[in-house]
Amino acid sequence: MSNRNYIRTERAPKAIGAYSQAVRCGQTVWISGQIPLDPVSMEVIGNSDSDEGVRSQIEQVFANLNCICKDSGGSLREIVKLNIFLTDMSHFHLVNEVMETVFEKPYPSRAAVGVLSLP
């Protein structure tokens, strides 16, 4: 018997592959990775060539996460761990700046990884 509940919200980008936006299993919600897609147009927002553009992309990712959290009955405040993937580690300080506006102390645990590319 499965106690899984598959979460789908129109307020965040739909899945662009063979995965669910999120899955609730018991009291834990597992959220799939997010990229800076506008949920309506399904287009990547912002320009990754400027700090302002990257900041808007980071804000969009957290907005998407917030919608999935809320529509699964939770909030960003309940996030325990974040895995962050960046194609340019020089933008790491922007992640910190945005996180300080999105989360309250104490912050969730976090890993940040530099990668060659993202979808």
Predicted segments with their positions:
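Short, polar/acidic, helix-capping and beta-turn segments at strand->helix junctions
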Residues: S2-P119
